[in-house]
UniProtKB/Swiss-Prot annotation:
Pfam family for this entry, one: SelO
Organism field: Halalkalibacterium halodurans (strain ATCC BAA-125 / DSM 18197 / FERM 7344 / JCM 9153 / C-125)
Gene name per UniProt: ydiU
Cofactor(s) the record lists: Mg(2+); Mn(2+)
Keyword Metal-binding: yes
Family (UniProt): Belongs to the SELO family.
Binding site for Mg(2+): 258, 267
Protein name according to UniProt: Protein nucleotidyltransferase YdiU
Keyword annotations of the record: ATP-binding, Magnesium, Manganese, Metal-binding, Nucleotide-binding, Nucleotidyltransferase, Transferase
Annotated binding of ATP, by residue: 94, 96-97, 117, 129-130, 180, 187, 267
GO molecular function, one term: AMPylase activity
Catalytic class of the enzyme: transferase
Disulfide bridges in this chain: none
Enzyme active site: 257 (proton acceptor)
Domain of life (superkingdom): Bacteria
């Protein structure tokens, strides 16, 4: 491993504040070099927003950085330690196949983690090889960028590099490394790790770092600033999970190590988007009991946040009973905050600007009709946007006809015009989502044929989900019956 000195001016501007934290929270480790790195996809617009030159990033020396073969100046590679409740069971974890290069400082002073996923073994790899297969890395690229375009807080994908090496899973697969960009990789599980294995001073150091990085508006001398940290994280997660529900996104593995403190969606292993509306929808092959089903996600969010509150207890009050009382009061606010964001989002999807007491029943009645008649979630709301009742597949159902009349009457009680409602719905109801069969089609072409054009076309369509353009229609079609039920795998 060598420090890279010959790369053209890419624009790397690394800082390494995470290394100021107690050493128990990370291990210094360099990426393992790969045989023949090749850049297969680069996110030009994200690169530019980070202050990086997309042309220079395609230079061979820059590709070596993205592959982990060279370390850029100022970087301090490390793997982060964390814990987590995985399907409800607590375990000590850590970055087993991901290495944080450092924090990129953008031209406007923002700070983003730059992480290489699939870059080799770390002290936390256990029995893993530290590597990643091409398919799951491309999948994360597609889904994370689609989520960003949908306006949902998420980690981002800067690039995918193939390694020229094979990884061995159920079959032999081409290896790859994803460059992931995040506001940070601090998780609920990070706090759980320190609370279980560290001292109160180490926990305080992590909390202070997190407040400074993500919530600088919380003053250092504020009374009980750690309670403010809990409040801020609850608020962000309530809003995030509401946004998931509004587009039919199913994370698939909502373990506490996959809940970020920043409020970004992270870890796209077994995730997928719901086609037919059903609250019990599960895609993950390992979620055999439906713990992380679509309809359970809000409740799991509350459960995870309760684990975060438990980790913070020593900082909330000297008296444990008082600390528990404070934590419980904040956790009890989560459900109301979630419903507020979800209800406002559903109103927007139906073109409603103001609030009425019957709105919740109007929304739930529509969802019940959709569930009963197996209507597509995304396409139903898109059809309502353009008043194309036949496109819903519900137009000949009496329950829907009666509901539609109620909805029209509700719209008529607003000051806003029908055009206003139509425009609000266009901005709130995507024409396209990353349909599972379309994602698989793109991955199959890339992995099996080294054809990235299918993926590039898909990414182009997904980049403007609210455009409602003619070319998006083909990507809005449902999967063939033979593609159902769809199953996802974590890719590890």
């Amino acid at each position: 491993m060598t420090e890279n000195k010959g790369t053209p001016e890419v624009g790397w501007s690394f800082d390494t504040r995470y290394t100021d934290l107690p050493s128990m929270m990370f291990s210094n480790v360099e990426p393992e070099p790969v045989e023949a790195p090749k850049l297969v996809i680069l996110n030009d617009s994200l690169a530019q927003s980070l202050g990086l030159d997309p042309v220079a990033l395609q230079h061979q020396n820059s590709i070596a950085v993205l592959a982990g073969n060279e370390v850029p100046k100022g970087a301090a590679p490390l793997a982060q330690a964390y814990a987590g409740h995985q399907f409800g069971h607590f375990t000590m974890l850590g970055d087993g196949r991901a290495i944080l290069l450092g924090e990129q400082i953008t031209p406007n002073g923002e700070r983003f983690d730059i992480q290489l996923k699939g870059s080799g073994r770390t002290p936390y790899s256990r029995q893993g090889d530290g590597r990643a297969a091409l398919g799951p890395m491309l999948r994360e690229y597609i889904i994370s960028e689609a989520m960003h375009a949908l306006g949902i807080p998420t980690t981002r994908s800067l690039a995918v590099v193939t390694t020229g090496e094979s990884v061995f899973r159920e079959t032999v697969l081409p290896g790859a490394i994803l460059t992931r960009v995040a506001a940070s990789h601090i998780r609920v599980g990070t706090f759980q790790f320190v609370a279980n294995a560290g001292s109160e001073e180490e926990l305080k150091a992590l909390a202070d770092y997190t407040l400074a990085r993500h919530f600088p508006e919380v003053e250092a001398d504020r009374e009980n600033r750690y309670l403010a940290l809990l409040q801020k994280v609850i608020k962000r997660q309530a809003e995030l999970i509401a946004k998931w529900q509004l587009v039919g996104f199913i994370h698939g593995v909502m373990n506490t190590d996959n809940m970020t403190i920043s409020g970004e969606t992270i870890d796209y292993g077994p995730c997928a988007f719901m086609d037919v509306y059903d609250p019990e929808t599960v895609f993950s092959s390992i979620d055999t009991r439906g713990r992380y089903a679509y309809g359970n996600q809000p409740r799991i969010g509350a459960w995870n946040l309760a684990r975060f509150a438990e980790a913070l207890l020593p900082l909330l009050a000297d008296d444990q009973d008082e600390a528990i009382k404070l934590a419980e009061a904040e956790i009890s606010n989560y459900a109301e905050q979630f419903e507020h964001h979800w209800l406002n989002g559903m109103r927007a999807k139906l073109g409603l600007f103001n609030e009425e007491s019957e709105d919740l029943s109007l929304i739930k009645d529509l969802l019940e009709v959709m569930h009963k008649h197996k209507a597509d979630f995304t396409n139903t709301f898109r059809a309502l946007t353009f008043d194309e009742q036949e496109e819903t597949g519900l137009h000949d159902k009496l329950e829907f006809t009666e509901w539609h009349e109620r909805w029209q009457a509700r719209l008529g009680r607003q000051e806003q015009t029908k055009d206003d409602s139509h425009n609000l719905m266009k901005m709130s109801n995507p024409a396209v989502i990353p349909r599972n069969h379309r994602v698989e089609e793109a991955l199959e072409a890339a992995v099996e044929q080294e054809d990235y054009q299918v993926m590039e076309r898909l990414l182009k369509v997904l980049a403007n989900p609210f455009a409602h353009s003619p070319e998006q229609k083909a990507y809005a079609k449902l999967p063939a019956p033979c593609a159902i039920p769809y199953r996802t795998y974590c890719g590890t």
